[in-house]
Amino acid sequence: MNLDSFFSFLLKSLIMALSNSSWRLPQPSFFLVGIPGLEESQHWIALPLGILYLLALVGNVTILFIIWMDPSLHQSMYLFLSMLAAIDLVVASSTAPKALAVLLVRAQEIGYTVCLIQMFFTHAFSSMESGVLVAMALDRYVAICHPLHHSTILHPGVIGHIGMVVLVRGLLLLIPFLILLRKLIFCQATIIGHAYCEHMAVVKLACSETTVNRAYGLTVALLVVGLDVLAIGVSYAHILQAVLKVPGNEARLKAFSTCGSHVCVILVFYIPGMFSFLTHRFGHHVPHHVHVLLAILYRLVPPALNPLVYRVKTQKIHQ
């Protein structure tokens, strides 16, 4: 199967997953509450969220523009950074506009299919972002442990294939979400206690059995995060081992500094994400509005901070 036919297959699978004709019952629209318990303060909460979204848009578009326009930045590190910026734009834009509309003007209704599309883009591209962080760790490993062969190992063809694998993984893992959700029967109460269509928030509204949905969602989350964090950890273990062999403190600090921006981005992405995931799944005593706020911030804070981190930590981007 060639690349074109494979992507055609993926597209057909996605269309089938979203198609109403495959299922017996028409599905209702949903109503997004926003931040339950903080309805009176939602206008004020929307202000910092809007600023974060604006920072994400300006910062990531700027990163993409700089890398596109400067041929000297067409290297593996910056090409992976451009992938990260593009993904951050999608993640932020798939949630923020609707969330802000809910908080500011009470535009709470969202169609069933639109809800699924929003959820698909949010979760699929978050998975892709995790994959790009693994690719960036691989790039740092090759740059530090095999510096003389860096350009031959990670040439543009290899970078393109890595990007394709990251994209396909995100799509393949999330298409079953849509298929499983389409099989659920929803009760009359279609009110989502959230500001956007989050997977578990939608699953909890179903009247039918949701064990498979819950199990698959948990499996995908643990699989993606577990394997990706393991890969990043192994890469940095080798990097640390190589750097400690470098003679002289100044040379070691210089080697470590090349990884500084990537380490910051990893921490910004995984720590809030894991905290949000664990509190949503297992933090039954945590107030619901805290769950929602954490989930919204997780979709906006990394896209807003990543360009700032790379601007400060990377000399070429700063210049």
Curated annotation (Swiss-Prot):
It is found in: Cell membrane. Residues 65-72, 139-157, 236-255, 313-319 are cytoplasmic. The keyword Transport does not apply. Keywords: Cell membrane, Disulfide bond, G-protein coupled receptor, Glycoprotein, Membrane, Olfaction, Receptor, Sensory transduction, Transducer, Transmembrane, Transmembrane helix. Residues 1-43, 94-117, 179-214, 277-291 are extracellular. It is a multi-pass membrane protein. The keyword 4Fe-4S does not apply. Glycans are attached at N20. One of its GO terms (molecular function) is olfactory receptor activity. Disulfide bonds join C115-C207. GO terms for cellular component: plasma membrane. InterPro entries: GPCR_Rhodpsn, GPCR_Rhodpsn_7TM, Olfact_rcpt, OR51/52/56-like. Its main location: membrane. The chain crosses the membrane at residues 44-64, 73-93, 118-138, 158-178, 215-235, 256-276, 292-312. It comes from the Eukaryota. Odorant receptor. Belongs to the G-protein coupled receptor 1 family. PANTHER family: OLFACTORY RECEPTOR 52L2-RELATED, OLFACTORY RECEPTOR 56B1-RELATED. This is Putative olfactory receptor 52L2. It comes from Homo sapiens. The lineage of its organism: Eukaryota, Metazoa, Chordata, Craniata, Vertebrata. The gene is OR52L2P.
